[in-house]
Regions:
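Single conserved hydrophobic/aromatic residue that forms the stacking wall/gate
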Residues: 1-11
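Short, acidic/polar
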Residues: 12-22, 55, 105-117, 214-225, ...
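Active-site acidic/histidine proton-transfer and metal-coordination neighborhood
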Residues: 16-17, 21, 61, 78-204
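Acidic/histidine-rich catalytic cores of soluble enzymes
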Residues: 17-19, 29-30, 69, 149-269
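Short beta-strand segments at enzyme active-site cores
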Residues: 30-32, 66-71, 123-131, 173-177, ...
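Glycine-rich, proline-tolerant flexible connector loops at the mouths of alpha/beta enzymes
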Residues: 33-60, 75, 130-138
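Active-site-proximal loop/turn and secondary-structure-junction residues that shape catalytic pockets
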Residues: 34-38, 71-75, 130-134, 178-182, ...
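C-terminal helical cap(s) of enzyme catalytic domains, especially alpha/beta-barrels
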Residues: 299-304
């Protein structure tokens, strides 16, 4: 549903319209989500370079490039714990709801189509989520059985290695957004995944400092540690203001009431000047992609 202030944003439901808006606001590229056929037909893009050239042409008319493709929702469904199956069903076609085996198969096919599409578009980095087999156990109570974490990452790697291998054959890097709710949610878990995949050369990082603010991780030192793996960058701000009632876990509060919440760039606590300095220092060659989820301002304000 769109209220008055959002209506002008909501009616832009075609790639051409979105491109016009982005160009008018000074953007140079767009990151395309791959789960909405009104914008991008992933099945067609995976099999047809002509279709991909057509999409590039639509945006080129507006003076825009495609920065990357996003496969967050499909990646999430590559690995899902049963505790989340009902909530994650909405990411898949309705005919797959309640059928985890077929849903997972669909997600893997989608990932491979997106890899093919990225190759057709001439784009190396591709955004995704790792999915989560273990995240429900991140707090050690009840105590985790010995070996559970190792087995979990072994299974996660088993699911992703064929996809990573396909990505390698197409010259595509899968950039996992390090994100709460995913098994890859900090540097330690990314390293666990790397080890489980035998340091697969196509396993990379989508760096988003907002998620590190919310879990109180040093987002600047993270760049020092993982500079060689960071191939994508989301510009998203956040703030963390703990109280005597709630902290990192948030107390099940709505976003606007949580101690940790996303904000528009400049309204939060992220030191973007230092981030851009570090990324430049390490010769980061990717795009700075605005991702907006502010709980206070409107989408139109965020786009501007």
């Amino acid at each position: 549903q769109c209220d008055r202030r959002q209506r002008q944003m909501c009616i832009r439901d075609s790639l051409k319209d979105i491109g016009k808006l982005a160009s008018s606001l000074g953007y140079k590229a767009v990151q395309i989500p791959t789960w909405d056929k009104r914008i991008f037909d992933l099945d067609k893009a995976g099999s047809s370079k002509d279709y991909c050239d057509e999409v590039k042409g639509i945006l080129k008319e507006q003076g825009l490039e495609i920065s990357e493709l996003s496969t967050h929702l499909q990646g999430q469904l590559v690995a899902s714990h049963p505790a989340y199956d009902l909530m994650f069903d909405v990411f898949a076609p309705e005919n797959l709801h309640g059928n985890v085996k077929e849903r997972t198969k669909w997600a893997i096919e989608q990932m491979n189509n997106a890899i093919n599409a990225s190759n057709h578009l001439g784009i190396s980095p591709m955004a995704s989520f790792s999915g989560a087999l273990l995240f429900h156990t991140f707090y050690p109570w009840p105590q985790r059985p010995t070996g559970l974490v190792e087995e979990g990452f072994k299974e996660l790697a088993k699911r992703w290695k064929p996809i990573l291998n396909h990505a390698d054959s197409k010259g595509v890097d899968i950039c996992y957004e390090i994100h709460p709710g995913e098994d890859l949610h900090d540097g330690v878990t990314f390293e666990r995944f790397l080890k489980a995949t035998n340091n697969h050369s196509r396993a990379k990082i989508l760096y988003d400092p907002s998620h590190f603010v919310l879990q109180q991780l040093d987002y600047l030192q993270f760049i020092d540690f993982y500079k060689d793996y960071i191939k994508m960058f989301h510009v998203k701000d956040a703030e963390f203001n703990p109280t005597g009632k709630a902290g990192v876990y948030g107390g099940y509060l709505d976003w606007k009431d949580r101690p940790g919440r996303f904000r528009s760039p400049g309204d939060g606590q992220v030191d973007f000047k230092s981030i851009f300095s570090k990324l430049s220092q390490y010769d980061f060659e990717g795009w700075a992609v605005l991702e907006w989820e502010c709980c206070i301002k409107s989408p139109e304000q965020g786009a501007k």
